Amino acid sequence: MSQGKVVQCIGAVVDVEFPRDQMPKVYDALILDEDSPTVEAGLTLEVQQQLGDGVVRTIAMGSSDGLSRGMKVKNTGSQIQVPVGHGTLGRIMDVLGRPIDEAGPIEADEKRSIHQKAPTFEELSPSVDLLETGIKVIDLVCPFAKGGKVGLFGGAGVGKTVNMMELINNIAKQHSGLSVFAGVGERTREGNDFYHEMKDSNVLDKVGMVFGQMNEPPGNRLRVALTGLTMAERFRDEGRDILFFVDNIYRYTLAGTEVSALLGRMPSAVGYQPTLAEEMGRLQERITSTKVGSITSIQAVYVPADDLTDPSPATTFLHLDSTVVLSRDIAALGIYPAVDPLDSTSRQLDPQIVGEEHYSVARAVQSTLQRYKELRDIIAILGMDELSPEDKLAVARARKIQRFLSQPFHVAEVFTGAPGKYVPLKDTIKGFKAIVNGEYDHLPEQAFYMVGSIEEAVEKAKTLN
């Protein structure tokens, strides 16, 4: 185990000098080998570049405050290793797999490197089974595949985390399997809320949690998604169906941008790292299902300035099976979840996978909403009276559909006061089919707002008259 010393420290970037014949390899973990009152004990550094003459450039996984030149560093000779297996369930860990929940050491019989190869093409096993979420708009227009990858896209404050929490609530509780949650560069409060949500629902013993919050240095935030993924991969390789939640994948990209700039690489479009596509691909290619087990991944993706063409969300799009796009315009109407049914897509929305009825109802809903969108300018200028009878009917139905796409969430009960609703897929299809076919043209549109099934809308209409 070779020993070196710190020769330069610029923020999170630390240069370490070793004897020339004992230079660490790229991605080797180095540990600060001396006690100092000013610096975190056992600070881990990950080698990013070999500069030559025995000097390597590393990124600190913790705060580098108090580091000084000449401090001793030892090479562990291996990459960052984290505990995996059943000992991680019900525990909260940091990027290095250390417990941060004050519940004692993690009893794991195996450790794995966070840098693993993606499964080969022969090992992959695509799935066409649907994963019911109980959220009407998602199940109807952008259904999830079991073992697929889903992205929740949205700008600031349109409800990505609330939607993610509801999906965890509906799927993790219904699905008796195991889940891994990676909190990448998000608020500490949200991690705390998630922990208590899981504890109150008695599913904590089926969830492993890894957090690298927004107050952590960029090296930490860049690697925490890999730590969570390594834990999920171990469960998959045991032959299990795993849920892997990431909040937020954009912060992973942002941490990569910070690290890239610190390492002196030339930035590319909009200041992102030149290796953006490669870094994203390396992470996403590992989140996949094999013939042994599956990983179903749900990832929140922050969209900077609501611009879906920004390089970060645009690069993420390529890897996903379903994209759930949250719209500020829909949120402004008070319709939650604020999912845009015209912008959201799914590869599963195919008559051969979801069935002819589901497919035709979803397309009828989208075409009705599209017609309303086209007529909105005419209505704004000339008013409803100038429309033809067919268009008036289309607008009335579209407004009912729009309101029926809203739904009270279990996780939002605290601040809405309305009990949450889980709507089975068959009830969702039945309700929207009836609205599109004009069976509820006589009901007021307010009856369809914030209800679960269509029967609830009918009951609500009775109270409005």
Swiss-Prot record:
InterPro entries xrefs: AAA+_ATPase, ATP-synt_VA_C, ATP_synth_F1_bsu, ATPase_a/bsu_AS, ATPase_alpha/beta_chains, ATPase_F1/V1/A1_a/bsu_N, ATPase_F1/V1/A1_a/bsu_N_sf, ATPase_F1/V1/A1_a/bsu_nucl-bd
Catalytic reactions of this protein: ATP + H2O + 4 H(+)(in) = ADP + phosphate + 5 H(+)(out)
This protein's GO CC annotations: plasma membrane; proton-transporting ATP synthase complex
Coiled-coil ranges (or none): none
Keywords from the named record: ATP synthesis, ATP-binding, Cell inner membrane, Cell membrane, CF(1), Hydrogen ion transport, Ion transport, Membrane, Nucleotide-binding, Translocase, Transport
Catalytic EC class: translocase
Keyword check for Plastid: no
Residues reported to bind ATP: G154, G155, A156, G157, V158, G159, K160, T161
Known EC number: 7.1.2.2
Keyword Amino-acid biosynthesis applies: no
Matches recorded under Pfam families: ATP-synt_ab, ATP-synt_ab_N, ATP-synt_VA_C
Topology versus the membrane: Peripheral membrane protein
GO MF terms held by the record: ATP binding; ATP hydrolysis activity; proton-transporting ATP synthase activity, rotational mechanism
Subcellular compartments: Cell inner membrane
Oligomer status and interactors: F-type ATPases have 2 components, CF(1) - the catalytic core - and CF(0) - the membrane proton channel. CF(1) has five subunits: alpha(3), beta(3), gamma(1), delta(1), epsilon(1). CF(0) has three main subunits: a(1), b(2) and c(9-12). The alpha and beta chains form an alternating ring which encloses part of the gamma chain. CF(1) is attached to CF(0) by a central stalk formed by the gamma and epsilon chains, while a peripheral stalk is formed by the delta and b chains.
Functional summary from the UniProt entry: Produces ATP from ADP in the presence of a proton gradient across the membrane. The catalytic sites are hosted primarily by the beta subunits.
Family: Belongs to the ATPase alpha/beta chains family.
Descriptive protein name: ATP synthase subunit beta
Organism: Methylobacillus flagellatus (strain ATCC 51484 / DSM 6875 / VKM B-1610 / KT)
Phylogenetic lineage: Bacteria, Pseudomonadati, Pseudomonadota, Betaproteobacteria, Nitrosomonadales
